[in-house]
A protein has these predicted regions:
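Beta-rich interaction/scaffold domains
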Residues: 1-77
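Extracellular carbohydrate-recognition regions
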Residues: 70-115
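Extra-cytoplasmic beta-strand recognition segments
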Residues: 79, 180-215
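Short carbohydrate-recognition loop motifs
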Residues: 131-151
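Short beta-strand segments enriched in hydrophobic/aromatic residues
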Residues: 145, 197-199, 226-228
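Extracellular/lumenal carbohydrate-interaction signature centered on repeated Trp-anchored short motifs
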Residues: 159-175, 180-193
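Extended low-complexity, serine/threonine- and proline-enriched intrinsically disordered segments
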Residues: 210-237
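Extracellular carbohydrate recognition and processing domains
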Residues: 231-261
Length: 261
């Protein structure tokens, strides 16, 4: 019901709930000369995740992928689980995830990959999006606006706001707002979005040229968007997530205020 989501070693395919996951035979398109084991088109039981090994044409390179077929998505999120994105053996930033009904992961996305480019020496807890211990019950997601330093100023993006969303983040340096690819398939009609938050505004509000905007205060936003995904519009991004004509429903917080409760 949408394009597969392919990350470093994971492949997620979304299908309708009435499909029988115990007998599926996915077919994979590989680079010329590469092989896959088990073979493309093999019938397998995807009620649990299955692994495939891809071997390069010269046989010198092998990589294992975990493939999942997903029918039902979570509707409750607790931010209790976290793992690290690692680069050259170093834990760079935290990735929050939820456990699906079959024990597999639904990962939250954020703008942390973009911030990693701007602030390569930052520790995981210094990134805009990280896990925190001070949740209403248990853990929570902590979103903080951070400076992107000299690199960010060159791109007229002097700050990076903490954010959290379902979907994918692919860095687009020419237009960072297009880096966010929002959304996962839902087949039910949502009724409401309910949760808890704390918020403290920054001391100074600046524009993309790092100039202070007088007599205005920082603010935040919480919203949920349901939109129709098509071949021409497979996803919405930061440039059109609130304005695109494919939007079917939207919920957005109305009363935004600073609170420590």
């Amino acid at each position: 019901i949408r394009e597969p989501v392919i990350t470093n070693d994971q492949v997620k395919l979304y299908i309708n709930g009435w499909e029988d996951r115990s007998k599926l035979a996915p077919r994979f398109e590989l680079t010329p000369g590469a092989t896959i084991s088990p073979a493309s088109g093999t019938v397998r039981d995807f009620t649990t995740p299955q692994t495939y090994v891809v071997t390069s044409q010269d046989g010198q390179w092998k990589k294992t992928y975990t493939v999942r077929f997903i029918t039902d998505l979570l509707t409750e999120y607790h931010f209790e689980n976290v793992e690290y994105y690692t680069f050259e053996g170093v834990n760079k930033f935290e990735k929050l995830y939820e456990l699906d009904t079959d024990g597999s992961k639904t990962e939250w996305s954020s703008g942390n990959p973009g911030y990693m480019i701007a602030s390569q020496a930052a520790k995981p807890k210094d990134f805009p999006t990280a896990q925190d211990d001070e949740g209403y019950i248990g853990k929570c997601a902590k979103l903080v606006t951070r400076s992107t330093g000299a690199f960010g100023k060159m791109l007229n993006a002097p700050i990076a706001a903490g954010n959290l969303f379902l979907g994918n983040f692919t860095v687009e340096l020419s237009d960072m707002a297009k880096s966010t690819r929002f959304g996962l398939p839902y087949t039910s009609k949502p009724v409401a979005v309910v949760g808890y938050y704390k918020y403290k505004p920054g001391n100074v509000l600046i524009d993309k040229y790092s100039k202070e905007i007088p007599n205005q205060s920082d603010t935040f936003d919480i919203y949920a968007v349901m939109y129709e995904s098509t071949k021409d519009v497979p996803y919405l991004d930061g440039t059109n997530i609130k304005t695109h004509p494919n939007i079917v429903m939207m919920a957005q917080i109305k009363e935004r205020k600073a609170t420590d409760q």
